[in-house]
């Protein structure tokens, strides 16, 4: 018992220590670029010749274990930057990236046509980057100074860029060339910084293009799901049903609201089985007129609805209060009713 209590206390102490450690590490991300530990190694005494006491015979020396003397000229201590080289990200579907010198490139498929250049310009304008020169015919522009703000820098950088879109074989190349780079007002030209801040701008553009593509896809899906076509059909046994042009997930999500519009209230549902129980109360003549459909002539009562998954379509089959499927004429009458309900 004592062992268990002691073990529990140790676990709690270890957990608290871990939380404090993570909090300390995340409080200032500048330390991600520095070697862990203190800088006592900078004060270490240099290597010295070994002097043996009088009368002691030392083994024969061997050059195999000699430590060479070096005169390092690189950065040490907090001046040492251990961050890996920055890499441009191919966030756009089907794209790839490359980096050469001071230029980062994003190669995308030609399918975007003439929309790529306006999208690149829109990304920069959305970020409020000032454009000093712009040639839409040549699809090239030059920015004013872009101020960067990174937590892993002691002094912030700013850069001027030339950005262009050019055909390259069967692809289009979005190119970012770093024209000037400064840190705290002083010019910077080291390879690591040039790569990091060329890549910084490229990744901003890449993320913006990816967001545009995602927004366009979502808008297209919303348009498709807003106007879902409804048709009369029959199942494998010849019983009437409705077929909605829309995937099961979309139809299932929109069904309760659509049913409510036609006078059917959902009282129970099981998504995994595609079952719904609804109570039907016919609408008034004015409500049918407002919906834009005619009264299908169904009797009041409790109905069961079976929703089927037909890949990019869904089936709706109603069972009346007496346990029978709807007649063909009743099913056909519901086509216009649900077409109107899904469209509103």
Curated annotation (Swiss-Prot):
Residues where lipid is bound covalently (N-palmitoyl cysteine): 25
One GO CC term, this protein: membrane
S-diacylglycerol cysteine-type lipidated residues: 25
Keywords: Cell outer membrane, Lipoprotein, Membrane, Palmitate, Signal
Compartments where located: Cell outer membrane
Bilayer topology annotation: Lipid-anchor
InterPro entries, sorted: BamC (IPR014524), BamC_C (IPR042268), NlpB/DapX (IPR010653)
Predominant location: membrane
GO terms of biological process kind: Gram-negative-bacterium-type cell outer membrane assembly; protein insertion into membrane
Signal peptide residues on this chain, from the entry's feature table: 1-24
Free-text note on domains in this protein's UniProt record: Contains two well-defined domains connected by a flexible linker. The C-terminal domain may serve as an important protein-binding surface for interaction with other Bam components or substrates. In addition, contains a long unstructured N-terminal region, which is required to stabilize the BamCD complex. Only the N-terminus of this protein is observed in the Bam complex in X-ray or EM structures, most of the protein must be highly mobile.
Family designation: Belongs to the BamC family.
Cited function: Part of the outer membrane protein assembly complex (Bam), which is involved in assembly and insertion of beta-barrel proteins into the outer membrane. Nonessential member of the complex that stabilizes the interaction between the essential proteins BamA and BamD. Efficient substrate folding and insertion into the outer membrane requires all 5 subunits.
Subunit structure: Part of the Bam complex, which is composed of the outer membrane protein BamA, and four lipoproteins BamB, BamC, BamD and BamE. Forms a subcomplex with BamD and BamE. The Bam complex has the shape of a hat, with the BamA beta-barrel crown in the outer membrane and the periplasmic brim formed by the BamA POTRA domains and the 4 lipoproteins.
Identification of the protein by name: Outer membrane protein assembly factor BamC
Organism: Escherichia coli (strain K12)
